[in-house]
UniProtKB/Swiss-Prot annotation:
It holds the Pfam family Ribosomal_L16. Binds 23S rRNA and is also seen to make contacts with the A and possibly P site tRNAs. It comes from Synechococcus sp. (strain CC9311). The gene is rplP. It comes from the Bacteria. CDD domains: Ribosomal_L16_L10e. This is Large ribosomal subunit protein uL16. One of its GO terms (biological process) is translation.
Length: 155
């Protein structure tokens, strides 16, 4: 399972998830992708379960890229422990996900849109967030590039 090799600080505060993903929100490697529709945490176990489901379905036909990494430690206290005596120990790692973030990408010579969609659907079942399947050719352009493209067409 995914986790950082070493971190500067063992424990982090939980934080807030506000706004949409400004980075990692476009397809960069493959032709098909799974994009988050809502915010939340995805654990390293959920990422691994999704990866296995997709890999098992496509077999050796294509390549899968994982675009998220669990770099936030979540601490927990032992059950039936009295209040006080400090913060608990890190138990597992999560990736903080905002809407619009690309979670997985898939590509390859033998990967058709139908195969990719079914593999991503199997991965969706393992995740705690709403997600959608997107293709490279039907992906919306970021705001700045759309304006630049339309201005070059008019001139």
């Amino acid at each position: 399972m995914l986790s950082p090799k070493r971190v500067k600080f063992r424990k982090q505060q939980r934080g807030r998830m506000r706004g949409v993903a400004t980075r990692g929100n476009t397809i960069a490697f493959g032709q098909f992708a799974l994009q988050a529709q809502e915010c939340g945490w995805i654990t390293s176990r959920q990422i691994e379960a999704s990866r296995r489901a997709m890999t098992r379905y496509v077999k050796r036909g294509g390549k899968i890229w994982i675009r998220i990494f669990p770099d936030k430690p979540v601490t927990m206290r032992p059950a039936e422990t009295r209040m006080g005596s400090g913060k608990g120990n890190p138990e597992f790692w999560v990736a903080v996900i905002k809407p619009g973030r690309i979670l997985f990408e898939m590509g390859g010579e033998e990967i058709t849109p139908e195969i990719a969609k079914e593999a991503m659907r199997l991965a969706q079942y393992k995740l705690p967030l709403k997600t959608k399947f997107i293709c490279l050719d039907e992906q919306e352009q970021p705001a700045g590039t759309k304006a630049a493209a339309s201005s070059t067409v008019e001139s």
